[in-house]
From Swiss-Prot:
PANTHER family per record: CENTROSOMAL PROTEIN OF 70 KDA
Primary role: Plays a role in the organization of both preexisting and nascent microtubules in interphase cells. During mitosis, required for the organization and orientation of the mitotic spindle.
Originating organism: Pongo abelii
Organismal lineage: Eukaryota, Metazoa, Chordata, Craniata, Vertebrata
Name of the gene this protein is made from: CEP70
UniProt record, GO biological process: cilium assembly; regulation of microtubule cytoskeleton organization
GO-annotated molecular function: gamma-tubulin binding
Quaternary structure (record): Directly interacts with tubulin-gamma; this interaction determines centrosomal localization.
Keywords: Coiled coil, Cytoplasm, Cytoskeleton, TPR repeat
Protein name: Centrosomal protein of 70 kDa
TPR repeats: 483-516
Top-level division of the source organism's lineage: Eukaryota
Predominant location: cytoplasm
Subcellular location, record wording: Cytoplasm, Cytoskeleton, Microtubule organizing center, Centrosome
Length: 597
């Protein structure tokens, strides 16, 4: 663009003024070009041309207006740029503030969630404490009730013990009276014993045989007293029954009543006859157990023999004492030998007398006694003369045979018990120890108990069934020997207990009833696992989006390829811009852009 040049005038002043105006106008256009260049626009050039076809000519006013308009536009654009820059900065600040507020809101939300969790935990703890306090209160109430019950039971026991003490005191008093009565009876018994013995033997008892005879007298006296009491009791009963019968007969007004009473009397008389017959049988048995006349004769003969032996013993003692008194200093060797022999003979005689008394004791077995009777009868004539003890030899031999046969009996019983009751471990008999009858009785009693138990419990399995059960257990649980059965059973029981504890814990955690079956427990655990897997899948879908697995794999591969380069680029930017935060990269770049302008 070229401004319209004023027409040339003749005067020099006009030319100078025009030149100055031209220079001033060019300077203004230069200043405008500077402004345009500062704003990134191309400058305007003032061209001096003579050809006016391609030119547009403005006058001074229009050029001045143009300059003003350009200045205004440039100023307006600069102002708008400043405003835009301020808006960008304010927008960035607002974004930063929004991020801060969002982070604060997230923190507040997280804090609120934490507080809610804390509040829920506090509520649960409060509920637990309330439950514990209620349980403690219930336990205390139950304890109070139990203590009250115990107090009542103790009071009842105290009353019972008081009653028992009074009863014991009464029993003590009655026992004291009974003791007094028994003491009197014992004194009477001793008096009667001595009286009967003095009547029979015409002397005072002072030997062992005398004491045995006193015991025998006491036994028969007690039997006689018992029979007297029973007889008196039966006579009293018969008298009372006869009186009742007479009363019944007197009370029966009619013939029918008389017949009924007679029938009743016949029944009662039959029962009495039966009772009397049973008593008769008992008395006959008692009489059979009593010694016979022959036995009494034997006892008398033994008493006579013992008296003779006692007299001989007394004479020997007198002779020995007399010889000791006479020959205290003068003792020859033959006299010493005779005295020792006499003492040995005396001891032998005492031993044989004791053996004879044992053999003829009523407590001796019947077979032994019967076998020894013949020998005693054969030696009666000699006993009167020289008091021989030849009849003791066969008896002692028979006893030895019986004792030796006990070993065979023990062996046979042992084999029988091994067949019948093999689970009873009988202790081994020592060869040095003798076989006792108590051991044989113990074996027989054990076998009888087993037989009785088998008869009572017929449903009990036999030995073969039990053996089959044990072998099946060994095969089932892989136990090679019987010694490993009990440890394996303990292991099975411990595993079973652990499984029961685990099932009980799962039932408590899943809030199931204790009576629920294992199928219900397994189904609930399966449902819970299914729900957990579904929640995990939903969380993965929320993170990765609703895409298929192949696209997720591609995204992960792209991320693995892109992330190292992006991380290196951001590290370089942080080093160049000398900042530490990623959020400060964009504001720093904008500042550099503004500074470059």
């Amino acid at each position: 663009m070229f401004p319209v040049a004023p027409k040339p005038q003749d005067s020099s002043q006009a030319s100078d003024r025009l030149m100055t105006e031209k220079q001033q106008e060019e300077a203004e256009w230069e200043s405008i070009n500077v402004l345009l260049m500062m704003h990134g626009l191309k400058p305007l050039s003032l061209v001096k041309r003579t050809d006016l076809k391609d030119l547009i000519i403005f006058d001074k006013q229009s050029s001045q207006r143009m300059r003003q308009n350009l200045k205004l536009l440039v100023e307006e654009t600069s102002r708008q740029q400043n405003m835009i820059q301020e808006l960008i900065e304010t927008n960035q600040q607002l974004r930063n503030e929004l991020q801060l507020e969002q982070s604060r809101a997230a923190n507040q939300e997280q804090r609120a969630n934490d507080l809610e969790q804390i509040m829920e935990s506090v509520k649960s703890k409060i509920g637990e404490l309330e439950d514990e306090s209620l349980n403690r209160a219930c336990q205390q109430q139950n304890k109070i009730k139990d203590l009250q019950k115990e107090q009542k039971t103790l009071q009842v026991k105290c009353q019972h013990y008081k009653k028992k003490r009074t009863e014991q005191q009464e029993t003590i008093a009655s026992l004291q009276m009974e003791v007094c009565r028994l003491r009197k009876e014992e004194e009477d018994r001793i008096v009667t014993q001595n009286r009967v013995f003095a009547y029979l033997c015409k002397r005072v008892p002072h030997t062992v045989l005398d004491r045995q005879l006193l015991c025998l007298i006491d036994y028969y006296e007690s039997k006689i007293r018992k029979i007297h009491t029973q007889r008196q009791y039966k006579e009293d009963e018969s008298q009372s029954e006869e009186e009742n019968d007479y009363r019944n007969l007197d009370a029966s007004p009619t013939y029918k009543g008389l017949l009924m009473s007679l029938q009743n009397q016949l029944k009662e008389s039959k029962s009495k006859i039966d009772a009397l017959l049973s008593e008769k049988l008992n008395l006959q048995k008692d009489l059979e157990t009593r010694p016979t006349q022959h036995e009494l004769r034997l006892y008398k003969q033994q008493v006579k023999k013992l008296e003779k032996a006692l007299k001989k013993n007394i004479k020997l003692q007198e002779l020995i004492s007399h010889k000791k008194a006479e020959d205290t200093e003068k003792k020859d060797e033959p006299s010493k030998y005779n005295q020792q022999q006499a003492l040995i003979d005396q001891r032998y005689f005492q031993v044989l007398c004791s053996i004879n008394s044992i053999i003829h004791n009523p407590r001796a077995p019947v077979i032994i006694y019967k076998q020894s009777k013949g020998g005693a009868q054969n030696f009666n004539k000699d006993l009167v003369q020289d008091c021989g003890f030849e009849h003791l030899v066969p008896v002692i031999e028979m006893w030895a045979d019986q004792l030796t046969s006990l070993k065979d009996l023990y062996k046979s019983l042992k084999t029988l018990s091994a067949e019948l009751v093999p689970w009873h471990n009988l202790k081994k008999q020592d060869e040095n120890e003798g076989i006792k009858v108590e051991d044989l009785l113990f074996i027989v009693d054990t076998m009888l108990e087993e037989v009785e138990n088998k008869e009572k419990d017929s449903n009990m399995p036999n030995f073969q069934t039990l053996q089959a059960i044990v072998s099946h257990f060994q095969k089932l649980f892989d136990v090679p020997s019987l010694n490993g059965v009990y440890p394996r059973m303990n292991e099975v029981y411990t595993r079973l207990g652990e499984m029961n504890n685990a099932v009980r814990n799962l039932q408590e955690l899943l809030e199931l009833d204790s009576s629920s079956s294992l199928c219900v427990l397994v189904s609930t655990v399966g449902k819970l696992c299914r729900l957990i897997n579904e929640d995990v899948n939903e969380q993965v879908m929320q993170v990765l989006g609703p895409e298929d697995l192949q696209s997720i794999i591609y995204k992960l591969e792209e991320h693995e390829e892109f992330f190292p380069a992006f991380q290196a680029f951001t590290n370089d930017l942080l080093e160049i811009l000398e900042i530490d935060d990623l959020d400060a990269i964009v504001p720093a770049v904008k500042k550099l852009k503004v500074l470059s302008y």
